[in-house]
Design a protein with these regions (language model features):
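Short, flexible helix-loop junctions that flank or precede catalytic/ligand sites
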Residues: 4-5, 11-13, 19-402
């Protein structure tokens, strides 16, 4: 029945029904490039975007075969690829992003140490690669350099290193120096020599590093790594203590001062095989450097100690090859009886002459190594001459072969 009197219709005019409200579609979110190692271009990323995490940045470097990552506040991220600095095309890094990256690889205490000292050396292990960390402060702001350290240690054979390096590694005691400029692959060569001992000899190998770089799993040998700052407070304390820890082989990293050298020589003279590095470009320059750590009044004593303890010096450099890659070349001194006599007398010029004509002892000069690379077609003469410490001598040798 009608709700109105008399059953009539409503006296009010009908109100038209409003159409139902249909919400307008929301605009699609802007597309943000998703970075993966596979999608990242080799030299530059999509302008205006970049990987979100430090791990992604390092993974791209790892998968592309780059050696270093350079990051800094107010700077465009860059890689080092085959010796050359490479731009990424990503935006400059702001302070908040840089701080977030630090928290990915450092503890609060380590960050506080960097903020206090303005410098920091350390290491971090991702699931796919290990990195050596160096932090610095600069005019533009804080910055970091990450050196990628492969988890798999290349063998002496895989690196095509001279056979004499295996012979040196097999010696029971003495001092072996692997030298070269920064980025020349000293750590890789040392790791290969330690790996050979670990694979073939029953030894106790102790490394004292700042920081630990290549990590060796114990095989035939027992390997223990100690990192300055984490496992020992002071490098020299750890090195001195090592003599009481029953090692057969001691890797001490860089010989930076007289105290380190003295302990290394003492260890090598008391039945240990000791490996160390210096930033020198040739075998003879290495001898000059270590003798130069001592004053004139102590020269006779240090020359005698070095002549008795030194097994050999391997000075390494890296050279760009014809296929765009890089290979190592070596200046190798084996401390034969003749070399010992020259070291005792301080006649270092004669040592290089012996190196050039003692290939049967495993010795060679850097120029001989460079000449062979040119003759084998692995590099150009111009690139070899650019690396040579004695380019006129090398040029004459190259002319003599044509």
């Amino acid at each position: 029945t009608s709700p109105f009197p008399g059953g009539g219709v409503s006296p009010f005019p009908a109100v038209p029904q409003a159409p139902p409200l249909v919400p307008e579609p929301l605009p699609a979110p802007p597309l943000v490039p998703q970075f993966t190692p596979e999608s990242a271009p080799p030299l530059a990323a999509v302008p205006g975007a970049g990987p979100a995490s430090l791990e992604e940045i390092v993974r791209i470097a790892h998968d592309k075969g780059h050696s270093d990552v350079h990051l800094g506040i107010g700077e465009e991220p860059r890689y080092r690829a085959r010796g050359e600095m490479v731009r990424t095309g990503w935006p400059v890094t702001d302070a908040a992003t840089f701080s977030r990256w630090l928290r990915e690889i450092m503890s609060p205490a380590e960050i506080d140490s960097f903020q206090r000292d303005k410098e920091y050396d350390g290491s971090h292990a991702f699931s796919f690669v290990r990195v050596r960390i160096n932090l610095l402060d600069s005019l533009r702001g804080q910055a970091m350099v990450l050196r990628l350290i492969p988890q798999k240690i290349a063998s002496l054979e895989e690196l095509n290193l001279p056979v004499v390096l295996q012979e040196l590694a097999s010696r029971p005691k003495g001092l072996i120096l692997v030298t070269g400029p920064t980025g020349s692959g000293k750590s890789t060569t040392l790791a290969a020599m330690i790996d050979w001992i670990n694979s073939n000899m029953a030894r106790h190998i102790l490394t004292i590093e700042d920081p630990v770089e290549f990590v060796h799993e114990s095989r035939q040998s027992l390997v223990r790594h100690r990192e300055v700052g984490q496992h020992t407070k002071v490098f020299h304390n750890a090195l001195r203590a090592a003599l009481r820890e029953d090692p057969d082989v001691i890797l001490i990293g860089e010989i930076r001062d007289q105290e380190t050298l003295a302990t290394a020589i003492e260890a090598s003279q008391t039945g240990h095989l000791v490996f160390g590095t210096l930033h020198t470009n040739s075998a003879v320059k290495t001898i000059e450097r270590i003798l130069g750590m001592y004053p004139a009044a102590e020269q006779e004593a240090i020359r005698r100690s070095v002549s008795e303890s030194l097994l050999g010096v391997v000075a390494q450099g890296l050279l760009k090859t014809s296929d765009g890659k890089r290979c190592a070349y070596h200046d190798i001194l084996i401390n034969t009886d003749a070399c010992k006599d020259y070291i005792l007398r301080g006649d270092l010029e004669s040592i290089e002459e012996i190196m050039g004509r003692s290939g049967f002892d495993g010795m060679q000069t850097a120029n001989q190594a460079l000449q062979k690379l040119v003759e084998d077609g692995r590099c150009s003469a111009d690139d070899a001459l650019a690396q040579s410490l004695k380019p006129n001598e090398l040029a004459q040798a190259l002319r003599g072969r044509t």
